[in-house]
Amino acid sequence: MSIEERVKKIIVEQLGVKEEDVKPEASFVEDLGADSLDTVELVMALEEEFDIEIPDEEAEKITTVQSAIDYVQNNQ
Protein backbone atom coordinates (compact mmCIF):
# COMPACT_ATOMS: atom_id res chain seq x y z
CA MET A 1 0.00 0.00 0.00
CA SER A 2 1.41 3.41 -0.96
CA ILE A 3 1.82 6.31 1.47
CA GLU A 4 -1.06 8.08 -0.27
CA GLU A 5 -3.36 5.06 0.15
CA ARG A 6 -2.36 4.62 3.80
CA VAL A 7 -2.97 8.32 4.57
CA LYS A 8 -6.38 8.19 2.87
CA LYS A 9 -7.31 5.03 4.79
CA ILE A 10 -6.47 6.74 8.09
CA ILE A 11 -8.55 9.79 7.13
CA VAL A 12 -11.54 7.58 6.27
CA GLU A 13 -11.22 5.71 9.58
CA GLN A 14 -10.60 8.78 11.76
CA LEU A 15 -13.20 11.10 10.24
CA GLY A 16 -15.80 8.51 9.26
CA VAL A 17 -16.04 9.84 5.71
CA LYS A 18 -16.47 8.06 2.39
CA GLU A 19 -13.31 7.15 0.53
CA GLU A 20 -14.52 8.95 -2.61
CA ASP A 21 -14.77 12.22 -0.61
CA VAL A 22 -11.08 12.04 0.37
CA LYS A 23 -9.72 14.02 -2.58
CA PRO A 24 -6.24 15.62 -2.51
CA GLU A 25 -7.65 19.15 -2.27
CA ALA A 26 -10.25 18.30 0.39
CA SER A 27 -9.96 20.33 3.59
CA PHE A 28 -10.39 18.32 6.78
CA VAL A 29 -12.55 20.99 8.41
CA GLU A 30 -14.46 22.57 5.50
CA ASP A 31 -14.93 19.56 3.21
CA LEU A 32 -14.75 16.56 5.55
CA GLY A 33 -16.46 18.04 8.62
CA ALA A 34 -13.59 17.58 11.08
CA ASP A 35 -13.39 19.61 14.27
CA SER A 36 -10.21 20.51 16.17
CA LEU A 37 -10.28 17.28 18.20
CA ASP A 38 -10.65 15.24 14.99
CA THR A 39 -7.60 16.92 13.49
CA VAL A 40 -5.52 16.26 16.62
CA GLU A 41 -6.55 12.58 16.56
CA LEU A 42 -5.81 12.42 12.84
CA VAL A 43 -2.28 13.76 13.36
CA MET A 44 -1.75 11.24 16.19
CA ALA A 45 -2.93 8.41 13.92
CA LEU A 46 -0.53 9.53 11.18
CA GLU A 47 2.34 9.66 13.69
CA GLU A 48 1.55 6.14 14.84
CA GLU A 49 1.05 4.67 11.37
CA PHE A 50 4.25 6.12 9.91
CA ASP A 51 6.35 6.18 13.10
CA ILE A 52 7.07 9.90 12.79
CA GLU A 53 6.68 12.85 15.12
CA ILE A 54 4.73 15.86 13.87
CA PRO A 55 5.48 19.03 15.88
CA ASP A 56 2.46 21.19 16.76
CA GLU A 57 3.55 24.03 14.49
CA GLU A 58 3.73 21.58 11.57
CA ALA A 59 0.47 19.86 12.51
CA GLU A 60 -1.32 23.22 12.22
CA LYS A 61 -0.27 23.40 8.56
CA ILE A 62 -1.73 19.97 7.75
CA THR A 63 -5.21 21.06 6.72
CA THR A 64 -5.87 19.12 3.53
CA VAL A 65 -5.53 15.55 2.34
CA GLN A 66 -2.62 16.47 0.06
CA SER A 67 -0.78 18.38 2.80
CA ALA A 68 -0.95 15.28 5.00
CA ILE A 69 0.38 13.07 2.19
CA ASP A 70 3.16 15.57 1.40
CA TYR A 71 4.19 15.87 5.04
CA VAL A 72 4.47 12.11 5.50
CA GLN A 73 6.37 11.66 2.22
CA ASN A 74 8.84 14.40 3.15
CA ASN A 75 9.40 13.21 6.71
CA GLN A 76 9.66 9.45 6.51
From Swiss-Prot:
It holds the Pfam family PP-binding. Its main location: cytoplasm. The modification O-(pantetheine 4'-phosphoryl)serine is found at residue 36. Residues 1-76 form the Carrier domain. PROSITE patterns: CARRIER (PS50075), PHOSPHOPANTETHEINE (PS00012). One of its GO terms (biological process) is lipid A biosynthetic process. 4'-phosphopantetheine is transferred from CoA to a specific serine of apo-ACP by AcpS. This modification is essential for activity because fatty acids are bound in thioester linkage to the sulfhydryl of the prosthetic group. It is found in: Cytoplasm. One of its GO terms (cellular component) is cytosol. It comes from the Bacteria. GO terms for molecular function: acyl binding; acyl carrier activity. Pathway: Lipid metabolism; fatty acid biosynthesis. PANTHER family: ACYL CARRIER PROTEIN (PTHR20863), CARRIER DOMAIN-CONTAINING PROTEIN (PTHR20863:SF76). Carrier of the growing fatty acid chain in fatty acid biosynthesis. Belongs to the acyl carrier protein (ACP) family. HAMAP family: Acyl_carrier. This is Acyl carrier protein.
